[in-house]
Amino acid sequence: MLDNQSRITLWQTEPAALLYAQMLQGCLREYAGLEVPFTRGKPRAGDAVLTVDTALPQNRYTLSIMPECITLKAGSDEALCNGVQTLCQYIEQHGAVLPALEIEDWPDLANRGYYHDCSRGRVPKLDYLKQVADILCRYKINQWQLYIEHTYLFRDLSEAWREDTPLTAQEIMELDDYCAVRHIELVPSLSTFGHMYRILSTKTCCDLCELPDSEKIPFSYTYAGNHHTLNVSNPDALGFVKGLIDEYRPLFRSSKFNICDDETFDLGKGRSKALAEEQSERSLYLSHVKALCEYLVAQGVTPQFWGDIMWRFPESCAELPKETICLNWGYLPHQRENEIRDIAASGITQYA
């Protein structure tokens, strides 16, 4: 049983473990009514001990709750963070009097992701995003993507974001740092093909839109989602989105980048119609996706893209760089496996 003589003791841990001690301290304060200081050094009876044991596999931790002490051993700093989340959950359920317990735990899935739409509706503030990061850490989520169309403050695209409160470079970098110490990889995600309404409806960029004069049609969420695909027959289109990537990617320490490229409903139906009739819609789509993937791979970055369009011709996945990851999504409560099965048969790596 913990009491006011107890300590949260860090033993043979990385400096980052101070944060986990603070997490545990806050949990004990809120749910057990105890103000338990933390320290470093050799633990005593009655302490809650957080320690790294390199004899354990890196992703594994053991939690032992006995009358004389609480001991959390982990194979790595990340596993220690995960173990603290489990201990906090147990304290939330039982308060200061904790039933005896032995746990050995590790993740079955190496990549545990969460996707957050920051483009439709109100743009979240940094303080709120940090709260989300805390929740994701509690649930041991280790990858997080913010979906961005126009809601990042691109320096040359004020026409696109001036009616919103876009996230700034400083905010993204601060959030990236906040996530990193919680073992969450903040992965950049940026529309580079479909879903580019705000950007492609500006006077500066409307010539890059697949549909002529589409910038003159009043905004609606349905219209914006179904139209405003990049006109890949325009020789300036590829360079334009590469420029967006070049401005956005350096803000993140992640070695991944999601180019999205989903729901390109307009492709081959407007300005690129003649080229699509000559080459095929598949060729136009694949050429653009492949060019962006190769561009990222050349910089040591793992490209990701949404698989809804590629599923129409899954054999074409073999033409993409081998490092590419297909993100296979679905919203149904009982999601079918057709898309996952077909993409898997192509040999490409995928997230489901």
Model-predicted regions and their roles:
Residues 39-49, 152-155, 159-161, 313-316:
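Beta-rich nucleic-acid/ligand-interaction surfaces
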Residues 39-42, 190-191, 306-312:
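Acidic carboxylate-rich catalytic motifs and surrounding loops in phosphoryl-/glycosyl-chemistry enzymes
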Residues 303-342:
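Substrate-binding cleft/loops of secretory-pathway carbohydrate-active enzymes
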Residues 36, 186, 303, 350-351:
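Hydrophobic anchor at the start of a short beta-strand
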Residues 263-265, 347-352:
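Active-site clefts of carbohydrate-active enzymes
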Residues 1-112:
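Contiguous, structured surface segment used for ligand recognition
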Residues 109-307, 319, 325-327:
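Substrate-binding cleft of carbohydrate-active enzyme catalytic domains
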Residues 64, 107, 251, 318-320, ...:
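Extracellular/periplasmic catalytic domains that process cell-envelope and extracellular macromolecules
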